[in-house]
A protein has these predicted regions:
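Thiamine diphosphate
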Residues: 1-141
Length: 141
């Protein structure tokens, strides 16, 4: 799992209010979340942006094709060129990939407030669309 989400994943896995299901790949997580949606749940997929590349086929041939509304939380590794070399290209192109797939994006910053996040989540639910909440390193603890 992404180190940016480490504490969040630990919280979710220990909290009985949530059903945290770890996946071996991001495309597997997309498939599990799609099935959960079809079973009447409101899934959230947590992934590192390198996993976005792995999941593009699952997003385009399943989620977007069949209009399955998923809430993606994607960490922005490689943002601003400050990261390990393997994260730099995806960090540079991630927003472009999401734009090409017509997936609305909200970039969470330390200045974002709770109402902005709630409104973004409501838009996702009300419009029945897949959206992506982008997290930069250091925004969440």
């Amino acid at each position: 799992p992404c180190s940016i989400l480490g504490k969040s994943i630990l919280f979710l896995s220990r909290n009985k209010e949530f059903q945290y299901i770890p996946a071996t790949t991001e495309s597997e997580a997309i498939g599990l979340a799609s099935g959960a949606y079809m079973a009447g749940r409101r899934p959230v997929v947590l992934m590192q942006n390198s996993g976005l590349g792995v999941s593009i086929n699952a997003l385009t041939s399943l989620v977007l094709l069949y209009k399955i509304p998923l809430f993606l939380v994607i960490t922005w590794r490689g943002y601003g060129g400050n990261d390990a070399p393997e994260h730099l290209l995806m960090g540079k192109w991630m927003l472009d990939f999401l734009k090409v797939m017509n997936i609305p994006v909200m970039i969470l910053s330390k200045d974002s407030n709770k109402n902005q996040i709630v409104n973004f989540a409501k838009k996702q639910k009300n419009q029945g669309i897949t959206t992506a909440l982008i997290l930069k390193k250091g925004v969440i603890e």
